[in-house]
Amino acid sequence: MTITETNPSLPYAADDPRGLLLRSWAVATDVAASVGPDRLDDPTPCDEFDAATVRAHLLSVGQRVAALGRGEDPFSVGEGVDAVPGDDWRTAFAAAGMDVAAAWADDDLLDRTITLPWAEAPGAGILAMYVSEIVVHTWDLARATGQSPTWDDDVVATGFAALQIGLPDEGRIEAFEAARANMPEGTEDFTYPFDAALPVADGAAPIDRLVAWSGRDPRWTA
């Protein structure tokens, strides 16, 4: 069985961030592939993005993770695409997942320090950070298009822990402005992606806690 089939985490230990990321990517793939052409203009919890834009952004996130593993500049990857060959988004997302697995095949990458404008951490920590981004934007796309995916508890827990470290409750805007100063040329219009964390009820589902920490209302509807 390969990573593109039903168990993308099979080659990895249970706590390996590569497997966790690929499991989050499998959910993203299913959600992206299930967006009908009549839903592309639908609003999303990302106020400035419609469903088509969020889907394109998600694909670029996977491509950037692969670029990081290869030691390339992740910002060389465009923000998103308007179309993929044959309008086959499942194949495009699956290909990005395979690229991620190949690019991060070397175990040593998990301990290697990677520097981004907003973070410097070992590869394992960077992957966990991207788990949070993938899960949040998959939730955005699913909520916008009437889908109800489920995520493994350990995937959500990994993403939430990384988000709490990388996106503290206090000083978010200041941290973003500091990161913006280090962004490469051509990304000056990069907008602040997270609002203040929202409160959730005691006993809220893990996915609701994660998206609320990112500033999204878990009860959001179009």
Locate each region found by the language model.
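Extended, alpha-helix-rich binding/interface surfaces that flank or overlap catalytic cores
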Residues: V54
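Structured surface interface patches that mediate subunit assembly and partner/cofactor docking
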Residues: T2-G19, S24-V27, S34-D47, A67-V84, ...
